[in-house]
Design a protein with these regions (language model features):
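Residue-level recognition of single "structural anchor" positions
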Residues: 2-284
Length: 284
């Protein structure tokens, strides 16, 4: 079921605010308990709603079946031995700035000696963040194109002859979708992008078959989008297959023209590549 978009008030927190609000492990555990109880808590065993908090065990006890449910049960933190405060700090570091941050830097910031548990924590957080964003379908006017990111050649393909262009072993293919519409008032700056951007989705694809691309677009949109693409053959049947309410194709060899008609997908691809190069030495 698709998650409906909601307008929420976000409290911007800086580093000093974070340490003031969460000075120790006890404050983080209390915040997690209040959050879970506020957003609805039920017994994982019988579904009962009558739960009693046991501070000495840091768990709830179901009044109906007597099942004991730990503070982290059913959350992304379940099974982790890292303190709740480390999880809160990682969430803050991942979302507090526009620039990406590496797991190695998060490890340094929270003062952990071992890399593996920090990597697992960050991987879980990024996974659930992606799933949450994946629940919001794109709609309205939309641009679609593919991006190619330089990555290491997979081990099983290192002895194979290198391909060129689409399908190269040294490139990972990503389908980029961006809500893009003409603003009510024209941009003030002469060289500003002529369209305004909304939400964006990027998904790794294994091949460029029409069925693969159609499936990814169908998963990421509400089915009523007005899609604009280049002349790649895999996009031809989008409207016919009910993936888009209308489909506009731009066929041109002039890169400047494509940049004007499909500006935001190219900006997104460029920014993503720059972010990866600024944050990581290499990616697989």
């Amino acid at each position: 079921q698709d998650i409906k978009r909601k307008t929420i008030n976000i409290c911007i927190m800086n580093l000093l605010d974070f340490y003031r609000q969460y000075p120790d492990e006890a404050s983080c555990e209390e915040a997690l308990r209040r959050f879970r109880e506020h957003h609805g808590l039920f017994c994982s065993q019988c579904g009962g709603l009558r739960l009693s908090w046991n501070p000495s065990h840091k768990s709830w006890t179901c009044m109906d079946c007597k099942h004991e449910m730990q503070l982290r049960s059913g959350t992304v933190m379940q099974g982790s031995h890292l303190p709740v405060r480390d999880w809160f700090a990682a969430m803050f570091l991942l979302t507090a700035t526009k620039r990406a941050i590496s797991t190695k830097e998060i490890q340094r910031q929270i003062g952990r000696k071992r890399y593996q548990p920090v990597w697992e924590m960050v991987h879980k957080l990024r996974d659930v963040m992606g799933k949450r964003d994946g629940g919001y379908p794109l709609h309205g006017d939309m641009e679609v194109d593919e991006g190619f990111f330089s990555t290491e050649t997979p081990e099983e393909q290192k002895d194979c002859p290198l391909k060129r262009g689409r399908g190269s072993q040294r490139k990972t293919s990503v389908l980029v979708m961006a809500e893009s519409s003409l603003p009510k008032t024209p941009p003030a700056k002469k060289y500003s992008t002529p369209k305004s951007v909304g939400h964006i989705k990027m998904q790794v694809i294994d091949d460029f078959k029409a069925s693969t691309i159609t499936s990814k677009i169908k998963q990421g949109t509400d089915g009523n989008a007005d899609v604009t693409t280049d002349g790649f053959s895999s996009y031809v049947s989008l409207e016919k297959n009910g993936v888009a309410s209308s489909h506009h194709t731009v066929v041109t060899d002039d890169k400047r023209s494509v940049g004007k008609v499909l500006p935001w997908v190219h900006i997104v691809i460029s920014n993503a590549k720059r972010s990866i190069l600024d944050t990581y030495h290499d990616i697989k």
